[in-house]
Swiss-Prot record:
There is a cross-link at residues 62-65, 66-69 (Beta-methyllanthionine (Thr-Cys)). Maturation of lantibiotics involves the enzymatic conversion of Thr, and Ser into dehydrated AA and the formation of thioether bonds with cysteine. This is followed by membrane translocation and cleavage of the modified precursor. It comes from Bacillus licheniformis (strain ATCC 14580 / DSM 13 / JCM 2505 / CCUG 7422 / NBRC 12200 / NCIMB 9375 / NCTC 10341 / NRRL NRS-1264 / Gibson 46). The modification 2,3-didehydroalanine (Ser) is found at residue 45. This is Lantibiotic lichenicidin A2. There is a cross-link at residues 44-48, 56-60 (Lanthionine (Ser-Cys)). It is found in: Secreted, Cell wall. One of its GO terms (biological process) is killing of cells of another organism. The modification (Z)-2,3-didehydrobutyrine is found at residues 39, 42-43, 50, 54, 63. Coiled coil: none annotated. The modification 2-oxobutanoic acid is found at residue 38. Lanthionine-containing peptide antibiotic (lantibiotic) active on Gram-positive bacteria. The bactericidal activity of lantibiotics is based on depolarization of energized bacterial cytoplasmic membranes, initiated by the formation of aqueous transmembrane pores. When present individually, LchA2 exhibits activity towards L.lactis HP. It holds the Pfam family Mersacidin.
């Protein structure tokens, strides 16, 4: 605003632009849901986990940490 009088008058105005209430923030992040935004482990997840453990066990022959692992 180039008009300094209008700019000064606007400074005193109570305008809520840009303000977000706590309820709105919770709604944005899923904080007011009964169940949070998570992904459960599915049947295909267990296949990947089992394969990862098997490959890891085959590469590291002992349970102790060594320079090979």
């Amino acid at each position: 605003m180039k008009n300094s009088a209008a700019r000064e008058a606007f400074k005193g105005a109570n305008h809520p632009a840009g303000m977000v209430s706590e309820e709105e923030l919770k709604a944005l992040v899923g904080g007011n849901d009964v169940n949070p935004e998570t992904t459960p482990a599915t049947t295909s997840s267990w296949t990947c986990i089992t394969a990862g453990v098997t490959v890891s066990a085959s590469l590291c022959p002992t349970t102790k940490c060594t320079s090979r692992c």
